[in-house]
A protein has these predicted regions:
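Nucleotide-activated sugar donor-binding and catalytic core shared by glycosyltransferases
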Residues: 1-13, 25-147
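Short internal beta-strands
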Residues: 16-23
Length: 147
């Protein structure tokens, strides 16, 4: 039922939808006879994507609909609004800042989130500035040079 609700919402969107389907999701769509929801001009179904291709899609997207915590975080980093189809998220900070909207698996709530989507004008780097690896390497270098 949750999967069907999410797929129903896609019919509302006029924007192109690129839908990388995990094999289990694809099997569930076929098993529950939901493939008719994918027969729309604006929906392009593809195999799961690698990291670089996923990042490219996110960076060039108007918005992202996802159930992935990792994608939720990547949307925030790339300043792309996201609509979350999970009932809860571990990235509540991104929801509080307005970069992600918690819609859950409801066609109505997903569509409402899209219609009321407001892209925030600021970002407070609540998940960091993306400098953790550089800072860690510098600290390790300092420690090694003290020895």
């Amino acid at each position: 039922q949750n999967l069907e609700e999410i797929l129903k919402a896609f019919f509302f969107f006029y924007l192109p939808i690129i839908l990388p389907l995990h094999p289990r999701t694809k099997n569930a769509i076929e098993q529950f006879e939901l493939t008719h929801y994918l027969h729309s001009k604006n929906i392009q179904v593809c195999e799961p994507l690698g990291y670089v291709d996923t990042q490219s899609l996110i960076m060039n997207a108007t918005m992202v609909i996802t159930d992935s915590g990792g994608v939720t975080k990547e949307c925030y980093y790339h300043k792309v609004p996201g609509i979350l189809t999970d009932k809860q998220t571990e990235w509540v900070e991104t929801v509080k800042e307005g970069w992600n909207i918690q819609a859950g698996p409801s066609a109505k709530k997903i569509i409402d989130a899209y219609l009321n989507l407001k892209i925030p004008t600021t970002q407070n780097n609540i998940l960091g500035k993306g400098e953790a690896a550089i800072n860690t390497a510098q600290k390790l270098n300092e420690l090694l040079n003290k020895s």
